Every structure is written in C-alpha cells, then in structure tokens.
Amino acid sequence: AWGTAQAATDEGRYIEVTGTSEVEIVPDEIHYIIEIKEYFAEEFDGKSKEEDYRTKVPLAQIEEGLREALREAGVPNDAVRTQEIGDYWRESGREFLVSKRFDLTLTDFKQIDRIVRHVDTKGIHTMRIGELKNKDMQLYHQKGKIAALMAAREKAAYLVEALGQKLGGVERIIENGNNGFSPVFTAQSNVSSSDAASFDGFRTIKNHYSMSVRFEILDQ
C-alpha cells in the first residue's frame, strides 16, 4: 500500500510517499508449547459416562510418556523446559485435574513432525507454536527498511516526473509503526498425529516495514 502527499509551502515544494516491504524469514529457533493434563482412563473406553469416571491417570505418568516420546523424536533433555503447573476443575465442587506446560526449543519443523508422530495424545491438552526466532533478525530488519525506502523513492520519482518535475533530495524520513514481526502459523494445532502436515504452510516469519519519506520537488 502507498500513501502520497504533494504540497507547496513555505518550506518549499515537496512530495511525501510511504513505501512498504515484506521480508520472509525461515526461523532457526522454534518454541513449541505442549501442555499435559491428568485425565480419566474411562474417557477413552467408548462406553463410560462422565459420572462413572474413576481411574485418574496421574500427571507423573503422562509426563513420563511425553518425555519418552520426545526422546524418540530426537529432542534432547536440555531443550525441554517446564513452563508452569496449574489445575482444572473437572466440575465445580469435584476433583480437579493437574496440568503442566513444557516449552521445547527446537531448530526445525521436522522435529515437530516427529513429536506429533510419537506422542500419545491421551493426556495432551494443547500443542502449539509459541515463538519463532532467527539469529540474523537485525540484518533482516535492515534489509526490509532499506527496501521500503527504495520503494518510496521509486514511487515519488515517477509521480513527480509525470508532472514534468524532478525529484530532489530527502527532507524527512519517518519509520512508521507496526514494523517488524508477524509470525505465520496457526495459533494452536490439533493434537491429532494426522495433523503433522498441517504445519507445511506455516513455517516462516514475515516482517513488514513501512517508511514515509518526504522529497523536495525541483524544476526540470
């Protein structure tokens, strides 16, 4: 999108345009959040009613199974960090179910695919991407801002030349708000193992940049 203003004031004649750019980045650090929660074995027998739930599977057992699945998926122990512990009331006034959240630091999305294939979804409350990073993010920021500036100059030049004038020097540059990070991924995944491929279209970071530039207008 472009914004354009042209004016003649005591400051002289000028044109002000807004240039934008987008930079797509492949992350090299992925934070994947998994939350586990106690459950009742009867939930999965296909016949018991909720009032008949009696056999609660403890959190320690669920965590042990998750950690084993993570080892099988190639996730090292030092990449797993406990984020928080909480509880959920099964029903007001009745027994509550304890939960625990883990933050996994991964290096590529293939690890998520392997995790989804190995994990037992019973006891898994949510699985989602928490944050995407890249160690060269500042370099990408610079490239994105420069590209937005060049786009603004190109726009201003052909507009001024169309009126038989010439583009002069830069009088002002404003870096507009909302520059930067826009992760491209679903907020929360399904915990179904068949959903592994659902990440295929959500594996990049998109940074958006917007720069407003005022140029002097000169006679030909």
What annotation goes with each model-predicted range?
Residues 2-122, 126, 133-220:
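Short, charge-dense linear interaction motifs
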